[in-house]
Amino acid sequence: METMKEKIEKVRREFDRNTQNLTALNLIKYPEGTLGQQLGRFLLRANYGQNVYACHDDALQLLIAGSNSFTDDIAVQFYLLGNGSYGLRRLTAMVAGVLLKPHKIAYFYQKYNHGKAALRFYDVDHLGLLHLPIDRVRETFMIQASPPAPLRKRGV
């Protein structure tokens, strides 16, 4: 019988094997308009570097907000809370966002309601969706995306 540590290590190895080719440069080679290609462009526009590996959070950020501004980062957390994703990290980011951007509370609440209206997607394996058109993914899960805003450079 596997111990919990062995199970975690097995899942980690599987994840590493599945994501080893998900650099921004490899992702932009996906067909035009697909989630994979748009994710690669998102990572390059955000100045994350050519060899950065895409992660689940990057895909969610792209699907929901299309940008990585501080306000949109916080709005994504509210969206995911509305979609049923809970966690201390998420709640901490939301509290910080409300304290730092109190004038955006109505926007955050709107995003929360959009998350409630969407089908549950926060725990979907996005690796299997990279070849699909991004608009189709959004339509399938009823994701109401924000219009893309200018991306901020990493570390700014």
Report residues per predicted region:
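A cross-kingdom marker for long, charged
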Residues: 141, 145-156
